[in-house]
Amino acid sequence: GDIIHSNDSLYQGSKEFAVPKNRELTETIPFSASHIDMYVEVKGYIETAARSTSPLKLEVNNLSTWVNFNNEVTDDELATYYPLSDVKKQSYVYRFNILKQTEHPCLKLYDSDNKEIFSMQLADFLEKHPEINIDKNETIIPILIEFKSIGVEVSIPDWAIEDVKPEF
């Protein structure tokens, strides 16, 4: 099969209505997103000179490939996505869509020798970050993976944290 980098931004809406004979009718159909925007940034990973210069590879597996007419994600066919990276100063950025399913996906990073250097379950990340609301219509899951001298830290990028302090 073909390599999948992302799925399209998908929206679904339905509404029953009857158009009177020989009349016009205007109705609004509410749409809801079937997808989640993913933003994964990897910082601090420096390959040794002995390795090739090709970038890190992100693999996201156990992803559903379609939704039904009720906008429900199905687990009938699972796929692996290979998001494309945008190499920035000292970081790799992956932007892609997945269907609204968060139980099974696993993110894995591979170095240029195709050796797995990091993996994480998306469900575990979301459990640690309840501030990410995957139930809202337009959802983004921002993930920052930082390689440091003491190990790997996974967090939410600073730009994604909404520090709301309502004043009364």
Language-model features: where?
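A short, Gly/Thr-enriched small/hydrophobic beta-strand-prone motif that recurs across taxa
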Residues: F31-Y45
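Tryptophan-paired
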Residues: R51-P130
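Residues at beta-strand starts and edge strands
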Residues: R23-L25, S34-I36, S54, E103-P105, ...
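Hydrophilic extracytoplasmic domains
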Residues: P105-F168
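N-terminal onset of structured domains
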Residues: E47-A49
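Intrinsic-disorder/low-complexity, polar/charged segments enriched in Ser/Thr/Lys/Arg/Asp/Glu/Gln
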Residues: E24-T26, D37, K89-V93
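Generic detection of short hydrophobic beta-strand segments and adjacent strand-loop junctions
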Residues: K15-V19, E27-I29, A79-L84, F96, ...
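Short, low-hydrophobicity acidic/polar segments
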Residues: G1-S34
